[in-house]
Amino acid sequence: MPNFAGTWKMKSSENFDELLKALGVNTMLRKVAVAAASNPHVEIRQDGEKFYIKTSTTVRTTEINFHIGEEFDEETVDGRKCKSLPTWESENKIRCKQTLVEGDGPKTFWTRELNGDELTLVFGADDVVCTRIYVRE
């Protein structure tokens, strides 16, 4: 089983603004979000298939707890409440499908894939994909 545990620092980010645009976030909020999320700190704790992920930026901190294969409550990147279902897509990759609790919006998901000491986080909203690469601290 892959070990996602540790603290992670972002090395690169592609298409974050485009993702926020696809989610319908207005220009002013996008500018704030892009600036705030330019240097996130991520802490992951793992016990088998149970995960705790804390992501801290200058504007907000999010925490999620989940067990692979069990639905949990989460918020989309733009803060809407959703039900999320994480599954193993491959030996080193978790895919989490998100379903909005209310209202309409793009189909969203995230994946986290471990490649040695690099963690690739992908956010998706319909056909728009944001890729962020992290390295262990």
Curated annotation (Swiss-Prot):
UniProt KW keywords: Cytoplasm, Retinol-binding, Transport, Vitamin A
Residue positions binding all-trans-retinoate: 132-134
Top-level taxon of origin: Eukaryota
Localisation: Cytoplasm
SUPFAM superfamilies assigned to the protein according to its UniProt record, in alphabetical order: Lipocalins
Database matches in Pfam families: Lipocalin (PF00061)
UniProt short sequence motif Nuclear localization signal, positions renumbered to this chain: 21-31
Mitochondrion listed as a keyword: no
GO cellular component entries: cytoplasm
InterPro entries to which the protein is assigned, alphabetical: Calycin (IPR012674), Fatty_acid-bd (IPR000463), ILBP (IPR031259), Lipocln_cytosolic_FA-bd_dom (IPR000566)
Molecular function as annotated in GO: retinal binding; retinol binding
Free-text function comment from the UniProt entry: Cytosolic CRABPs may regulate the access of retinoic acid to the nuclear retinoic acid receptors.
Domain notes: Forms a beta-barrel structure that accommodates hydrophobic ligands in its interior.
Protein family membership: Belongs to the calycin superfamily. Fatty-acid binding protein (FABP) family.
Record-given protein name: Cellular retinoic acid-binding protein 1
Taxonomic source organism: Takifugu rubripes (Japanese pufferfish)
